[in-house]
Amino acid sequence: MALKARALYSFQGENKEEINLMENEELQLLSDVSLDGWLQGTNSRGQTGLFPASYVEIQSSRSGSVQVDYSGNAREYTDPPHQGSYDDDDEEDDDDWDDWDDGQTVVDEPSGSNGVSRSELQHHHHYSRPEYSHRPRPALERQDSIASGKRGSVVGRNLNRFSSFVRSGVEAFVLGDVPQFGGVAESHAIEMAPKGPQWKANPRPFNCSVEEPTKQTKFKGIKSYISYRLTPDHSNSPVYRRYKHFDWLYNRLLHKFTVISLPHLPEKQATGRFEEDFIQKRKRRLVLWMDHMTSHPVLSQYDGFQHFLGCQDEKQWKAGKRRAERDELVGASFLLTLQLPTEHQDLQDVEERVDVFKAFSKKMDESVLQLSSVVSELARKHLGGFRKEFQKLGAAFQGLSHSFQLDPPYSSEPLVGAISHTGRTYEAVGEMFAEQPKNDQFRFLDTLSLYQGLLSNFPDIIHLQKGAFAKVKDSQRMSDEGRMEQDEADGVRKRCRVVGFALQAEINHFHQRRLLDFKQAIQHYLKEQIIFYRRVSQELEKTLHLYDEL
């Protein structure tokens, strides 16, 4: 027998997968288990599709009705709310890192993602803890008005459950639904600078080297892996980490810092991962990744990162790893740790500033992609086409020298020797072209790859701010219409201000690093190009002198 439900509110579907509901309409449900707050069923007009679980009341065969909680499980509304604490046994214990499957590691992030969906999938249990669970309330009615009888309605929720604004929890933060934590020890200050808000500098800045990629084995050689020696200069105590350790840290960072553009880890490679070229490429990119991490005022002070860089004791490592995985100030809750400056900022000005950066980041992303494509093609020609052409030229000169020897009385040994040397010189120049990309083009491509990753994060981060702006406008409109208390609208505006300051601070840091990184990258590229062409010129000059001596 199909389950029945009654529509508590009217709902207008926005795509072909969603159906319309009318208030008090009788519905047939395919299941009473919701998926991300949505149910599937059939309305009185025979249309089958999705609709919000919070908009309906399920008719139970027993006395009373059934409502659906946020985790998607049907529950009698008369049951007391679950108050259990997080069950440690539910958490997968991966303390023995050497036994992890080498194939299970980070994958490339899709364009325009800061990893929110990845974090959601891999760490969903953090959001489903009882202390984070909130049964979805109707988008057109305020939760406190149901209990207290106050007039008015809350700002409508975004029903697109795939929106990063919803998934990240920032919508819940802006609407005041993220629980406060008493006695929060963690805090991150934002201060005003001449160019706008910026993260307060790390009072103990440091750098960390990435050196000595070494192939190691375990299980009597059955499994192999590469370890890297990391040496922070504030301790000068080296630690050794595998790529999967970086992967674990990266996932912690994704889970915690929703409004920060995280540098992407270099790609995972299943085959050829022990080849020297790949090992050196990954090392170069880990160096850039580490440099970006240590230069960021917030990321560099993250306890999980400090633990990653400094812990050498196995027991302490396990304790710190678990502590990082149980961190409650993650996602939208991280915004609770921010301390804002007292200076006033008009939200209209902030919105315009964000729009300017959005256009800038889009154009820069296109430019970086184009430059990366051109440099990659040039490197490919160095390795193949240029090398081959110079070898052909050298062989042609060698052929000419051999032909001059066919009539001995007129062969002129000095000239034959000079022509033969010319051929060998051009063959050597071809090898020089093939070796050159590792000195300049590959390193330049590493920087471009880093910024492709950073830029791909910003569309989702900007979307969070745009969503917050929309909630402010909605709340003020509802306050003007008398459907929301002004103090509630002010609260939405205040929390939107937090998101705005965080985004501007991140934009400020991005520009600071961009100016430094591209200055250094292009300087290095040009210097190496000059050295290269000087070497080519020197080889040609030596060959030229042979003809002067004839």
UniProtKB/Swiss-Prot annotation:
Residues 347-550 form the BAR domain. Residues 128-144 have a biased composition (Basic and acidic residues). PROSITE patterns: PX, SH3. Residues 1-61 form the SH3 domain. GO terms for molecular function: phosphatidylinositol binding. Plays a role in the reorganization of the cytoskeleton, endocytosis and cellular vesicle trafficking, both during interphase and at the end of mitotic cell divisions. Required for efficient progress through mitosis and cytokinesis. Required for normal formation of the cleavage furrow at the end of mitosis. Modulates endocytosis of cell-surface proteins. Promotes membrane tubulation (in vitro). May promote the formation of macropinosomes. This is Sorting nexin-33.
